[in-house]
Amino acid sequence: MIGEIGYIFLIFAFTLSFLQFFNSVKISFFYFSEESFKFLKSLTYFISFFLLFSFFSLIISYVISDFSILNIYNNSHTNKPLLYKISGTWGNHEGSLLMWLAMLGLYGLLFTKFTNQESSIFNSRALFAISIINIGFIGFTIFTSNPFERITPIPLEGNGLNPVLQDPGLAFHPPLLYLGYVGLTIPFAYSIAALLEEKIDNQWAKAIRPWILAPWIFLTLGISLGSFWAYYELGWGGWWFWDPVENISLLPWLLSTALLHSNRVTEKRNNLKSWTILLSIIAFSLTLLGTFIVRSGLLTSVHAFASDPARGVFILSFLFLVTFFSLILYALKYEKIENNKSFHLISKEGGLLLNNVFLCASAATILLGTLWPLFVEVTTGKDISVGSPYFKLVFLPLIIPAIYLSGISINLNWKLNAMQSILDKLGKFFIIFIFIIIGIAFILEGPVMMILGLSLSVWLFLS
């Protein structure tokens, strides 16, 4: 019975998402009224609650071992500890998608509750973008990945959770990572709304900042915890194996880091506005690309959930439509939103822009190495792999300057800095950095890159 309730909640959320879409279109482009906006907010609340309740219904079904649900039969067992029963909910394709939806509902709830209520039309346009994401993902879950699918006759016992996943890391790593992935929906929605309004200023940048920072924090925690889990679980290949799914999780983090820096320039100097918008769109698109890679089976990965081309086609089509129309809108509105002022390279904004270049180039090299085997297979029919030698060769020379520049940029002034002042600061920074490396190398005995990585981490912290 609980399974049916959870499925009905999904159907309700899907139906209301269409109402959310049509109502947001009416308010954003045709006719605004306070009553319509209040109704739109109510729809968003109901969608959020239905998605959260649907997810909790699946968790409860796991806890009580309802093996009449195929998903639970395949991934749980009555004798499993409570922790693994609960975390088993998202240790599979269908359950993880429902967790994605629950977090999408949570972010929609928080956005509606805490955004500036005076900007009703702007918020309606942001909810217009969110409604499209709701329809796409809820529809994908209902029609291709129903987590509440029944099985008959009802088995007496389940198959149990995959032994590799029976680790406390499963309870925290995927939720943190998904909070980061899904959280980038809000900056994306903010950017679409700003393009539609043709207004991007420092107030917009200030409002969007916490919605960028929160996903970045969750992605940082999720990736770090995943690396630690991979380290002590030998089956995953060490701290970082340059696996396609690992790579694709790093891409949104790199882009959201660049987005944080770019948005800071927009907030403080009213500059790099179009670049900030573009980063928001691409960062979110990369989360959709990650979903495609994990669930399509087109790239081999120890982290992949499923190998179902039909699901892959659905996600790829959705990725194409969202990204294509977002970039078309960006191109149409570019001249109306961009009024970049020139600034000196030797300044905080110049340093942050240069840092952005390195971060985006780093992301591009990872994306190329991850998708290259797929491109070669499609064009030539040959099966190749791109391993750590490539990534170490092209990624490290880009990310090391990016990290070092971050520490320097923080200490520069806005506008122009005197060259002598810069040289003095650079000299001090370089000496401090050398002492950090020597100190860590003296304390630790390990590979050069490990020492350099720790040194850069300390460098950033001290900066």
Model-derived segments and spans:
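A conserved hydrophobic secondary-structure block that centers on an alpha-helix together
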Residues: 11-25, 96-151, 155-227, 235
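Contiguous transmembrane helix-bundle modules in multi-pass membrane proteins
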Residues: 1-33, 51-53, 244-251, 280-281, ...
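Transmembrane-helix bundle segments that line or gate the permeation/cavity pathway
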Residues: 51-73, 78, 87-108, 140-149, ...
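Membrane-interface interhelical loops and short amphipathic "cap" helices
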Residues: 1-9, 32-37, 60-94, 146-174, ...
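Membrane-interfacial loop-to-helix junctions in multi-pass inner-membrane proteins
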Residues: 29-51, 113-135, 196-217, 265-281, ...
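Central hydrophobic cores of alpha-helical transmembrane segments in multi-pass inner-membrane proteins
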Residues: 9-29, 45-55, 80-84, 100-116, ...
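Structural signature of hydrophobic alpha-helical transmembrane segments
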Residues: 95-101, 178-181, 241-254, 289, ...
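Alpha-helical transmembrane segments of multi-pass integral membrane proteins
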Residues: 133-143, 183, 215-224, 283-290, ...
